[in-house]
């Protein structure tokens, strides 16, 4: 699978990343997704390494690092999982305050889905 966010403006990138993270955490809180799927898609060490190549605030890699801990919290402290997710959700929501989208700049969104992995051989 390949997920790609393409933005000409750093604030556009941060907005899309923030929204993706918020959706994942909210889906976990609402029990609409499972931890393994969300961690696989969003909260992995590779994501942190890729973010280091982009001039964004460290808070984004910190959030992804915190996301890598979700499975550990669920297994070691299951009673604290919702509190942990709510805290993560609040931190993500707080990031929107520092993002200023210019409505003058066109937004380019590219979606890529490789269907070949579903072909029966």
Regions found by a protein language model. Name each.
Residues 1-121:
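Acidic, Ser/Pro/Thr-rich low-complexity regulatory regions
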């Amino acid at each position: 699978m390949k997920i790609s966010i393409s933005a000409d403006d750093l604030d556009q990138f941060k907005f899309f990343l923030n929204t993706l993270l918020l959706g994942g955490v909210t889906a976990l809180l609402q029990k609409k997704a499972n931890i393994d799927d969300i961690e696989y898609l969003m909260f992995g060490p590779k994501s942190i390494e890729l973010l280091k190549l982009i001039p964004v605030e460290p808070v984004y890699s910190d959030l992804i690092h915190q996301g890598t801990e979700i499975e550990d919290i669920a297994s070691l402290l299951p009673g604290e999982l919702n509190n942990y997710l709510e805290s993560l959700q609040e931190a993500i929501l707080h990031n929107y305050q520092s993002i200023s989208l210019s409505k003058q700049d066109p937004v380019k969104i590219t979606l890529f889905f490789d269907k070949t992995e579903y072909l029966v051989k």
